Amino acid sequence: IPLVPTVHQMADVGPMDILAETNNEIGYPIVRDMDTFCYERQSAGSMEIGSYGHRPILHHPDEIPSNQEAALSPTEMPFTDDDFDPQMETAIELMDMLGDAEIRYAINGLLSMTPDTMPCLGETPEVRNLWSAAAVWVKEGPGMAQAVAEWMTYGYPRVIDVHGADIARFYDEERTDEHIWSRAEEHFNKTYGIVHPAEQWVGRRNLQVGPYFSRQEDLGAEFFQARTWERPQWYGANADLVERYGLSEREVEWDNRWWSPITVGEHLNLRENCGVVDLSAFQIYELEGPGAVEYADRLAVNKVDVPVGRSIYTPWLNSDGGFHSDLTMMRLGEDRVRIVTGVFDGGRDEFWTRRHMPTDSSVTFTNITKQLTTLGLWGPNAPAVLSQLTNQDLDH
């Protein structure tokens, strides 16, 4: 399971008359202090102070005590005062009444962190009928038991879409201890931070790159990571397009992060002229065998049994008609079908395909992503450009 046990410190501070006078377990709202990565939560006559502002403290599973060895719970490790002292000072600055109370109880509590911060739900790709419901925090807790129970019963969750938490989403490169620990260390202090939607990871980059990577770097490519793959978002070499199309930066600084007007210029130029698009990150699979076309037809909504050389774009649905994926399927031979899907869904789609394959050995599955690459030449002038490189008829 791609996760690492990570410490979240919490201390119970009290007693305080102002809290005891409420005569309730919770009489005041929870306070979330985004600047210091702390929260304060009433617990009867005490205040619980939790922090994500301390250094990342990760533990190997072998370091976690057994039920017999643990003083109270295996998830409660010995408290490290030095890590919490700065957090306590900021909490007192926010609520000075805390300075007159004492720490009654404190722990280094363990929670699970994954490489992309999402839970690990579903049947494991490695072991059939071994199910995971791990790295579920309070924010995901409600409904997760129902979702996983439905998944185990029907083969897919029915109550909500949890594809972003499907454990099959991870590629091999994301399952190594080095990757899991690096991502947990980088993300921990952002748990209570304000993270830009397009913000990129700093560590563990260039795990998978296309064959044009060095040339793209020469052109000043700005890469975003899609799971393990690096994809260029815009090229510094195209900066002249900003002036050509009269473009400018966005007014708000936040909106300019992880963005450039160059990408708009490239889009406009592609619509008027043409452009080359790197599609190396797309995942490519092949089904072969006497049952390949029949099985592919069963997977897809659209008809896959088309003339050889034709391709289709199609959804994949579950038996309730719920949406699983959308992708391209190509009939390459009488008994051969190619599947091309997006990098973010590649792991899930591969597992779905393997999980539902016929058991009579009439179909074989092969992942050929790293054997092929794809470039798209798009735009109204694409045929004219390509005609300079080939004598093939491009009318179709």
Predicted regions span which residues?
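Conserved hydrophobic/aromatic beta-strand scaffold that supports enzyme active sites
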Residues: 10-12, 30, 39, 120, ...
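Short, low-complexity Ser/Thr-rich regulatory SLiMs
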Residues: 42, 123-125, 329-333
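C-terminal catalytic lobe of FAD-dependent flavoproteins
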Residues: 35-36, 44, 55-62, 66-208
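Short Pro/Gly-enriched beta-strand edge/turn motifs at strand-loop
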Residues: 19-25, 99-105, 308-313
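Short hydrophobic-aromatic micro-motifs
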Residues: 39-41, 47-51, 132, 231, ...
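Glycine/proline-enriched, intrinsically flexible loops and inter-domain linkers
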Residues: 160, 164-396
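Central helical "cap/lid" subdomain
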Residues: 1-27, 159
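Conserved FAD-binding catalytic core of PHBH/FMO-like flavoproteins
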Residues: 19-50
